[in-house]
A protein has these predicted regions:
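P-loop NTP-binding core
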Residues: 1-256
Length: 256
């Protein structure tokens, strides 16, 4: 049964989509079967695989709202991808009147989860119903955090949301790790931000840091991951390192 990981942070621009895609491809390089789910109405994960969300007829909106079987919206790209479309912008309103609205994704995942080792979910930059659906369906959460002070403050709100979900909807969801992104070792501000994270969250902070580089912006323009775009570059190696950390954590949990 696949392990489900959401990438969540209500602040935008923290590399959620970049991390979802590139970690998924790094897992795939290890021989693991991976499904990515684009739960963000902006559709950036879908676009990063060369697909146009505006021209997609059936998407995660139809899965969540109309109970369309998930295999019908999975495209086979670098890894399998359940796509977003512009319609997903209306999903929160449509879900709000439905019974069991927080579990729509969990129910849809049940039919495909066994086919994968990992299911990775890209969430919108909010803590609304789409993100809550992702967290309810997840075993773990990876929190990408930009290495600046204002980004750190949003972690408290996310922790509060996770506590509410544990109490009422999914007692087993846990923070898989906190990932420093946009890291620039040359600046004191970046280094201090990582220190603050480590002081407050200890071993939850990944050793891997995702550094600032234009490679992460260039790869989606080509409709591909950075691991395919620049396979031997530092940007690709960072996500291979992250994959090793996540897999080592999974092994540690199994033997705990």
């Amino acid at each position: 049964m696949g392990r489900v990981i959401s990438f969540a942070n209500q602040k935008g621009g923290v590399a959620k989509t970049t991390t979802t895609l590139n970690l998924g491809v790094a897992f795939s390089e290890q021989g693991l079967k991976v499904l990515l789910i684009d739960l963000d109405p902006q559709g950036n994960l879908t676009m990063s695989q060369g697909l146009n969300p505006d021209s997609i007829e059936r998407s995660m909106f139809d899965v969540l709202v109309h109970r369309l079987p998930m295999p019908e919206v999975i495209h086979h790209a670098e890894v399998d991808l359940a796509v977003s479309s512009i319609d997903l912008a209306g999903a929160e309103l449509a879900l709000s009147s439905m019974i069991g609205r927080e579990r729509a994704l969990e129910k849809s995942l049940a039919e495909v989860k066994a086919n994968y080792d990992y299911v990775l979910i890209d969430t919108p930059p909010s803590l609304g119903l789409l993100t809550i659906n992702a967290l309810v369906a997840s075993n773990g959460v990876i929190v990408p955090v930009q290495c600046e002070y204002l980004s750190l403050r949003g972690l408290v709100q996310l922790e509060n949301t996770l506590s509410m979900i544990r109490e009422n909807l999914n007692p087993h969801v846990e923070i898989e790790g906190i990932l420093p992104t946009m890291y620039d070792s040359r600046t004191l501000h970046s280094r201090e931000a990582v220190e603050i994270l480590e002081e407050n969250f200890g071993e939850l902070v990944f050793d891997t840091k995702i550094r600032k580089t234009v490679r992460y912006a260039e790869a989606p323009v080509k409709g591909t991951s950075v691991l395919k775009y620049d396979p031997s570059g530092n940007a690709a190696e960072a996500y291979r390192d992250l994959a090793k950390e996540v897999l080592n954590g999974a092994q540690a949990r199994e033997h705990a």
